[in-house]
Amino acid sequence: MSIKPPSALSELVEALRALPGVGPKSAQRIAYHLMQHDREGAERLGRSLLFATEHLRHCEKCNTFTEAQVCEVCSDPERDPALLCVVETPADQIMLEQTMTYRGLYFVLMGRLSPLDGIGPKEIHFDRLVRRASDGIVKEVVLATNFTNEGEATAHYLGQTLKARGLAVTRLARGVPVGGELEYVDAGTIARAMLDRRTL
């Protein structure tokens, strides 16, 4: 007869498996480590997760994570409201900010088109983006989706729709490698891609 782990431990392993890049073995190792060697760390992690879920929300304007109704970037009067950069995730937005080359505003899709995974325009907040870009203030939309198949398809779809509304649409230059995700690219490469962006 095989011994099963306690249900509380099994639930922890399953919860960890839901994280990107964490498979069953990694989830099991993390769970056992936390319970055997780092109970204090486990409690801190639990408190931090609970605090984040209770206090983080989406910015009313750009859809990124914030603790206020409107995020710090959207509230900054020094930003250029005529320039709107579209990114897939808040992590991509942070990478672009670290380049210190972009002074416009953002819209965070919270994903990318992936019909096979059931992610269509609604799931990436397409209608909100169109409303934001069509506010009469935005003049150029910079598509900074990743250079993956889904990211390229998302950029193409967004570009066609936004150009039809009379907006100038540009795309990051190819300093970012094909298949690359902004979150993992160095700031210098992203800065060059932003400066060399091309018209679609």
UniProtKB/Swiss-Prot annotation:
Segments forming domain Toprim: 82-177
InterPro entries named among the record's database cross-references: DNA_Rcmb_RecR, Rcmb_RecR, Rcmb_RecR_Znf, TOPRIM_dom, TOPRIM_RecR
Cited CDD domains: TOPRIM_recR (cd01025)
Recorded GO MF terms: DNA binding; zinc ion binding
Zinc-finger ranges (C4-type): 59-74
PROSITE patterns in alphabetical order: RECR, TOPRIM
Transmembrane segments: none
Keyword DNA damage: yes
A Gene Ontology biological process term: DNA recombination
Gene3D superfamilies reported for this sequence: 3.30.60.80, 3.40.1360.10, 6.10.250.240, RecR Domain 1
Pfam families: RecR_C (PF21175), RecR_HhH (PF21176), RecR_ZnF (PF02132), Toprim_4 (PF13662)
Keywords: DNA damage, DNA recombination, DNA repair, Metal-binding, Zinc, Zinc-finger
Family: Belongs to the RecR family.
UniProt-listed HAMAP family: RecR
Function: May play a role in DNA repair. It seems to be involved in an RecBC-independent recombinational process of DNA repair. It may act with RecF and RecO.
Name under which the protein is recorded: Recombination protein RecR
Gene for this chain: recR
